[in-house]
Amino acid sequence: MSPTMPTSNTLSARLLDLTSPLQLLLYSLLYLPITILSHPTLLLTNPHKFQSLWFGALWKFLGPQMALSPEQTPYIAGLFNRAQGTVLELGPGNGDQMRHLVNAVREGRVERVVGAEPNAALHERLLGNARGVGLNPGQGKYVVLEAGAEPGSLIPALHRVGMYPSSSSSAGAGAAEGIFDTIICIKSMCSAPQHQMPEIVSTIHALLKPGGEFLFFEHVANDSDLLTRVWAWLLGWIWPIAMGNCHLNGRVDKAVKESGVFESCDVRNTKEFMGWNVFRYVVGVCRK
């Protein structure tokens, strides 16, 4: 057998990888009738809120399990271990990754966390997980914003809680010295509007204090394999609807590299990436 020919193990692994999104879609579709029965008219009267409740119900079940991935945990824990000072987490969901902050909070390295989570259906559990690691919302140690990462959502939300001087959607004036020591996102940038990613990265940079870090663990577009690209494109017709506006063609990695605004930026694939994975995960550490 030629050394360049795929082995049966490789073919099996690739088939499993290609079908893994279908398993997640199945979970999501199981929660669709449950959400319809719970809110029988909402799909017609408020489709956006219905989608949020649908995904919220799914993620309360699926999020904690996915947060325990043995392959991903070392990368994610390593990023949270770098967090310090005042932290902004973009898209914390249920707060399932909050456990990685326990030591930093106890040691005083992390003083306050702001969680920008656009899905209000997840806020109750998010606040509960914050209390569990010693970030008491009642003491101002944890602040939850009903906001996404895009400037038009995030900046006004920060203004409403008194953390940003202007309600303008631009993160320019008034943010020269920054607000946060650390901005972190874990598997959430895929749900942001991908066409706004350059503006999102620019806003993140503006909100960081000098020397602050933007830390991320995200799945992004796989541009290296034609079959995977076609499969991701086909899935893309239903994937965002069923998976909380998640996109398989994420581009945060490209956006930070192309921005040129960070003093240093290290973005690399995880060691598990085989070149053909549908979910291509990258780890990023960018310093202002």
Model-identified regions with their sequence ranges:
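Class I SAM-dependent methyltransferase SAM/SAH-binding core
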Residues: 88-160
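A short, conserved alpha-helix within the catalytic core of class I
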Residues: 191-203
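Short glycine-dipeptide loop
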Residues: 208-214
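C-terminal alpha-helical "lid/dimerization" subdomain adjacent to the S-adenosyl-L-methionine
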Residues: 55, 66, 217-280
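Conserved alpha-helix/loop element of class I SAM-dependent methyltransferases that forms part
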Residues: 57, 61-86, 96-104
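A conserved beta-strand element that flanks and buttresses the S-adenosyl-L-methionine
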Residues: 184
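C-terminal lobe and adjacent flexible extensions of AdoMet/dcAdoMet transferase-like proteins
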Residues: 281-288
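Short conserved loop adjoining the S-adenosyl-L-methionine
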Residues: 151-177
